[in-house]
A protein has these predicted regions:
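Juxtamembrane boundary at the C-terminal end of a transmembrane helix
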Residues: 206-223
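A contiguous pocket-lining binding segment that forms or flanks enzyme active sites
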Residues: 109-164
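Loop-to-transmembrane boundary segments
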Residues: 107-108, 114-115, 179-201
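Portal/gating segments that form or line small-molecule/metal binding sites
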Residues: 43-107
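Membrane-interface helix-loop junction between the first two transmembrane segments
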Residues: 16-35
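Alpha-helical transmembrane segments
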Residues: 3-4, 67-83, 135-147
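Membrane-proximal soluble regions of multi-pass membrane proteins
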Residues: 156, 160-191
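Hydrophobic transmembrane alpha-helical segments in integral membrane proteins
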Residues: 1-13
Length: 223
């Protein structure tokens, strides 16, 4: 468990304390953006492999057990995470490259300006609730913290990089899904999202639901 906690702390530091902060700006100024992104990607990949190994081998204590009815709710609550994740790949100004930032929010950006991180947050929160043991709490809680803290961190980074266009983008979007739409600052345009992201998201959700035991050794639903 100690190794898992140390690796989790390192993951949070790298993805929240470094990426998106002025410390990142200082490192980029020295080695360049491409070198930073390549190093960051490789380091993250290695670290996530180590996290999985540490999680699988950690001693754990069960704090609660999700009842069958709750597991059904959690299973269906995962569906929006898959749809958000798939939709986030269409011209995402808050992702790497910031494509289309000056053009204003479109598609899933009207729902939340951080669709990918929001999908990770939903995924992590559901797995924290559904597992209920200390090792899973540390492992999935790490990604939950990273996703939730990463949203304002990216906001701050983009505010520094794009002071001319970012305020207008923020004024028409929200972190919380559908908040900007509910407040009248934007409107849902389903045609901009298209049919493919939701359909693929549903298919992936159903596939993971069905094969979860085969892939990860644990069934999603208990009958």
């Amino acid at each position: 468990m100690t190794l898992l906690i140390l690796l989790a702390a390192l993951w949070v530091f790298v993805h929240v304390g470094l990426s998106g902060t002025r410390l990142r700006d200082a490192v980029v100024a020295r080695i360049g953006d491409k070198a930073f992104m390549a190093s960051f990607a490789i380091f993250s990949l290695v670290l996530i492999v180590l996290l999985v190994i540490a999680w699988r081998s950690a001693e754990t204590t069960f704090l609660w057990a999700a009842p069958p009815w709750l597991r059904w709710i959690l299973a269906f609550a995962m569906l929006p995470a898959f749809v958000l994740f798939m939709a986030s790949h269409k011209r995402n100004p808050t992702a790497v490259g910031n494509r289309g930032l000056g053009e204003g929010p479109r598609g899933i950006q009207r729902v939340t300006r951080h669709p990918m991180l929001m999908s990770f947050a939903i995924w992590a929160a559901i797995h924290v609730i559904g597992n209920g043991d200390t090792a899973a709490l540390v492992f999935f809680g790490t990604f939950l913290i990273t996703a939730v803290a990463g949203m304002p961190s990216i906001d701050a980074k983009l505010a520094r990089r794009h002071p001319e266009t970012w305020p207008a983008f923020v004024a028409k979007t929200s972190i919380l899904p559908f908040a900007a739409i509910a407040q009248g600052r934007n409107q849902l345009v389903l045609s901009e999202i298209g049919w493919m992201p939701p359909v693929v998201g549903v298919i992936l959700w159903a596939a993971i639901l069905h094969f979860h035991r085969s892939f990860f050794g644990v069934p999603v639903l208990l009958f």
